[in-house]
Design a protein with these regions (language model features):
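Single-residue signature of alpha-solenoid repeat helices
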Residues: 73, 125-128, 132, 178, ...
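Register position in tetratricopeptide repeats
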Residues: 100, 171, 205-206, 239, ...
Length: 506
């Protein structure tokens, strides 16, 4: 029986960007739940003047440049003696000013102090991300109400910008830049899983697996059970599983087995949390090989046990891969049940039909083979392997039959279909059937098995779930030399395609 799916062993990219609402800067802000974060913004004089300058900066944000007012605030609140009286109001205003400065395109995050308003040590450097964190930490520590108020402050535009920069950089494999941006993001806010997820990928790229594991744990902890972060949790679990699998593949001896067990745990954790189908399919494929490496082949049926009892919870591809795993481990009854679940959902799934027929043959359920092969050859008529399934079926029926007349009839049918398969002058095979939001692509080959060079025309109907023809495409193929093959491709922008059939080649 042919293996249908190779291990889908790739790491999906992080989300391209994140978005969040940006709260406005407030005077004596109210925290969540109605509790107030109160501090007096009228004293000392430096705080009062900075409060007025902040109001002017807010007005300038509408269409002007608030940088002069922001520099004034920084200068006032860092003057000699300004730190000691009313430190919470000072820190709140200073953190707000630094955040707004980070939004200005002319201000560098690592800036010369004088450019942001400092008069003390004016030629030194200031890290505005660290400065924001230091200021807002003072406010957070002043009361629970203020701590609640500061949370949305930390996730304003500068945090969004640097976090998205980290995501974009890691997706572009610019890992050094991604690390810088992610750590700046964490300086502003440590409650989001996104920067930890970025750093997980960065350390994976460096093969620094202890650091990767640490960041992965932090990402999962930050994501918690929040449904907003479901994609992040799945991404992290997939990273952990694929990394442990890769390490197991390159390891030897006891370490190889230990890493295989680690990967098994990671894949099972992923499967327990309802991953998207492509990752569920990867989990099934990888778990099968990992159990062998770990010396625990007896556990392979556990991979698909829940699929047998509740196939509706799983996608077509994952069920198909599970059927392959079951058949490879000589469990044709399980394989047949899984392939049948695919066919019940999608009667135009030729790989499932092919393997379902083969599973019935292994089970000696010969009378179940015919209807399956009839459907298969209706979809895929110019593949001799499909017609050979009839020959295997009649061979089984013939051997089990006691009545001479029926034995002879079955023998005649066996010879008929075996001859048809052997003498078919061409063979159609498919190498890709991909479907996504951009359309549908079918790629295959035609082999000239006998005779002179010949050209063919592939005419393919793409079918929806009800069997309706969504699109008909044709592709000229040839001339094809004897004993040679040529590729064909048929593409359409049509979506909603679940299967295909083609006209018999002549």
């Amino acid at each position: 029986m042919k293996a249908l799916h190779a291990s889908l062993f790739a790491v999906s990219a992080l989300a391209s960007s994140i978005v969040a609402a940006t709260p406005s800067f407030a005077q004596n802000p109210a925290a969540a739940g109605g509790a107030e974060c109160n501090f007096d913004q009228s004293k000392p004089q430096s705080v009062a003047r900075a409060t007025l300058a902040m109001a002017q900066a807010q007005s300038a944000l509408a269409g002007g440049d608030p940088t002069p007012q922001l520099r004034t605030i920084v200068g006032l609140l860092n003057a000699a003696g300004a730190k000691n009286e009313n430190p919470v109001a000072r820190a709140y205003l200073l953190g707000s000013a630094y955040l707004l400065l980070l939004e200005r395109p002319t201000i560098s995050p690592i800036a010369v102090r004088s450019t942001v308003g400092h008069t003390v040590d004016p030629t030194g450097l200031i890290d505005l991300y660290a400065a924001v964190d230091s200021a807002l930490t003072i406010v957070e520590q002043s009361s629970p109400a203020c701590a609640a108020q500061v949370t949305p402050f930390r996730q304003q535009k500068p945090w969004l910008a640097v976090t998205n920069a980290a995501i974009n950089a890691v997706n572009a494999s610019k890992f050094d830049s991604a690390e810088i941006y992610a750590k700046r993001s964490l300086t502003l806010d440590k409650t989001s899983p996104y920067p930890y997820s970025v750093l997980t990928t960065v350390e994976k790229s460096r093969k620094n697996y202890p650091a990767m594991m640490e960041y992965a744990k932090k990402a999962l902890a930050a994501a918690g059970a929040d449904t907003t972060y479901a994609d992040v949790r799945e991404q992290i679990r997939f990273e952990l599983a694929t990394t442990a699998t890769t390490r197991s593949e390159t390891a030897t001896g006891a370490e190889k087995k230990a890493l295989a067990r680690e990967a098994i745990t990671a894949w099972n954790d992923l499967m327990a949390n309802d991953p998207v189908e492509v990752r569920a399919t990867a989990a099934v494929a990888n778990l099968a090989s990992l159990y062998v490496v770990a010396g625990d082949s007896a556990s392979i049926p556990k991979i698909y046990a829940s699929m047998l009892t509740a196939p509706s919870k799983y996608g077509e591809s994952a069920l198909l891969q599970a059927g392959v795993v079951a058949s490879q481990n000589k469990r044709p009854k399980d394989a047949a049940a899984l392939f049948a679940a695919v066919v019940e959902r999608n009667p135009y799934q030729r790989d499932a039909l092919n393997n379902l027929a083969a599973s019935y043959l292994f089970m000696d359920e010969f009378r179940k083979v015919g209807p399956v092969v009839a459907k298969l050859t209706e979809l895929d008529p110019s593949n001799p392997d499909n017609w050979l399934l009839y020959a295997f079926m009649y061979s089984g029926l013939m051997k089990a039959e006691k009545t001479p007349k029926l034995r002879n009839a079955y023998t005649d049918s066996l010879v008929l279909y075996n001859t048809r398969a052997e003498k078919m002058p061409m063979k159609v095979a498919f190498t890709e059937f991909s479907r996504n939001s951009e359309g549908t692509t079918l790629i295959g080959t035609i082999e000239n098995r006998a005779g002179p060079a010949k050209s063919y025309t592939m005419s393919v109907d793409f079918l929806d779930a009800k069997g309706n023809v969504v699109y008909t495409g044709t592709a000229p193929v040839g001339p094809i030399a004897p004993k040679a093959s040529k590729e064909f491709r048929i593409k359409t922008e049509k979506t909603g395609v679940v299967g295909y059939r083609y006209k018999p080649l002549v």
